[in-house]
């Protein structure tokens, strides 16, 4: 998207700080009620009218527009094709819109088992078949079940705040809620570009203050070998 220079943050760090400071509602207090299976939003419907009411008059544009997607766990068993149940939730292009959406959807710890929540650059679908994702791969970080909320938020802020040196390589991120653990992955475009992937993986660990090794899997290998796919890169 095109924005005037005066509206842009002077650096990635400034933009990241701006994003954090623009949050109209902290999440340190009472948590939301547990969701029924397949739910993603709370009591307030996530629609344009509700979001518009909370936006400030002078928005802070992001470098890219981003779209939240949700894969409903209750719909997965009814779909014969993988990915058929993934649906877009909302596309945002400003700091204020991000917080309006983020504060109106449940965080990973409150999602139903087998739910998948995505945040991808606008017009990139979170599917292997998408032309931008087809030759890519993903880095993955594992968390104990229900302990990925902060990691998910920090990942989102780093992505939309353009904190990665090789940010053009990034397609988006996903959090997968499973019985024993939560998994957050960053999807990238060109899996064979080892230098770019290593840069993204190392910086991501720094942003999360994550000390364990993480691995990068090519999408092609994931399609062929499923859970038995092996890491091509480690950082």
From Swiss-Prot:
Changing residue 228 to L: In strain: PI 161375, allele nsv. It is found in: Nucleus; Cytoplasm. One of its GO terms (cellular component) is cytoplasm. The keyword rRNA-binding does not apply. GO terms for biological process: defense response to virus; regulation of translation; translational initiation. It comes from the Eukaryota. The keyword Lyase does not apply. Coiled coil: none annotated. It holds the Pfam family IF4E. According to the redox status, the Cys-133-Cys-171 disulfide bridge may have a role in regulating protein function by affecting its ability to bind capped mRNA. Disulfide bonds join 133-171. Residues 60-63, 70-106, 154-163 are annotated as: EIF4G-binding. Keywords: Cytoplasm, Disulfide bond, Host-virus interaction, Initiation factor, Nucleus, Plant defense, Protein biosynthesis, RNA-binding, Translation regulation. Residues 13-24 have a biased composition (Polar residues). Displayed sequence is cv. WMR-29 and cv. Vedrantais. Component of the protein complex eIF4F, which is involved in the recognition of the mRNA cap, ATP-dependent unwinding of 5'-terminal secondary structure and recruitment of mRNA to the ribosome. Recognizes and binds the 7-methylguanosine-containing mRNA cap during an early step in the initiation of protein synthesis and facilitates ribosome binding by inducing the unwinding of the mRNAs secondary structures. Key component of recessive resistance to potyviruses and Tombusviridae genus Carmovirus such as melon necrotic spot virus (MNSV). (Microbial infection) Susceptibility host factor required for viral infection by recruiting viral RNAs, including uncapped and non-polyadenylated RNA, to the host ribosomal complex via an interaction with viral genome-linked protein (VPg). Belongs to the eukaryotic initiation factor 4E family. EIF4F is a multi-subunit complex, the composition of which varies with external and internal environmental conditions. It is composed of at least EIF4A, EIF4E and EIF4G. EIF4E is also known to interact with other partners. Interacts directly with eIF4G. In higher plants two isoforms of EIF4F have been identified, named isoform EIF4F and isoform EIF(iso)4F. Isoform EIF4F has subunits p220 and p26, whereas isoform EIF(iso)4F has subunits p82 and p28. This is Eukaryotic translation initiation factor 4E-1. It comes from Cucumis melo. The gene is eIF4E.
């Amino acid at each position: 998207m095109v924005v005037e220079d005066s509206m842009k943050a002077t650096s990635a760090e400034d933009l990241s700080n701006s994003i954090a400071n623009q949050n109209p509602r902290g999440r340190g207090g009472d948590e939301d009620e547990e969701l029924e299976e397949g739910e993603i939003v709370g009591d307030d419907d996530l629609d344009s009218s509700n979001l518009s009411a909370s936006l400030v008059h002078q928005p802070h544009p992001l470098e890219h527009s981003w779209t939240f997607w949700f894969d409903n766990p209750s719909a997965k068993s009814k779909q014969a094709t993988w990915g058929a149940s993934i649906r877009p939730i909302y596309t945002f292009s400003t700091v204020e819109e991000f917080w309006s959406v983020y504060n109106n959807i449940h965080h990973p710890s409150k999602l139903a088992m087998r739910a998948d929540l995505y945040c991808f650059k606008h017009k990139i679908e979170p599917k292997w078949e998408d032309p931008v994702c087809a030759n890519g791969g993903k880095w993955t970080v594992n968390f104990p079940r229900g302990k990925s909320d902060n990691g998910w938020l920090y990942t989102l802020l780093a992505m939309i705040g353009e904190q990665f040196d090789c940010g053009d390589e990034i397609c988006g991120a996903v959090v997968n809620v499973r019985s024993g653990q939560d998994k957050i992955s960053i999807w990238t475009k060109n899996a064979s570009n080892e230098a770019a992937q290593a840069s993204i993986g190392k910086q991501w660990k720094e942003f999360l203050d994550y000390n364990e090794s993480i691995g990068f899997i090519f999408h092609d290998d994931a399609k062929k070998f499923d859970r038995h796919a092996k890491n091509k890169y480690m950082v």
